[in-house]
């Protein structure tokens, strides 16, 4: 496992105690909670968290999804393996779905970046980790891309000439539930 991380929790609904309880229960100074005056939606909430991040890289994790315990270790190993000046600026991995039944399924085994495929759909998706200096340079996502903010960020990273690296392990489990994008329903 990897110990040098911080977890930023954006509490856009402070009237509910779930996020503050989670931060308190963690009892770990690496877990930091921030409160917004109102729920600005996924893009504004994400952008506010990005502004609070202190690390060299920012990894995006949805509130209801699951990471393998060695995910950060594998990403950092890829960074450390690369020569200085050649480090990847955008990292992503294979993923699967965690079904409502409690079963794992539908693995997605990706390849190194395929630009043509990326222009047709978001073949990078999860577990997206981006160099903070790159985000500072290209900016955060605009509010009008809500629901596709990860894709927007990935495309803007590509347009900037960023170096991408695929980590060939299933490290991210996308939880399927009614209304989630993973569910494929019209409501998501």
Question: What residue ranges belong to the model's regions?
Answer:
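The conserved acidic donor/metal-binding loop of glycosyltransferases
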Residues: 12, 62-66, 94
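A recurrent flexible, glycine/aromatic-enriched loop bordering the glycosyltransferase active site
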Residues: 43, 51, 98, 104-133
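Short aromatic/hydrophobic "clamp" motif used to bind/position activated sugar donors
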Residues: 58
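Catalytic beta-strand/loop signature of glycosyltransferases that borders the donor
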Residues: 164-171
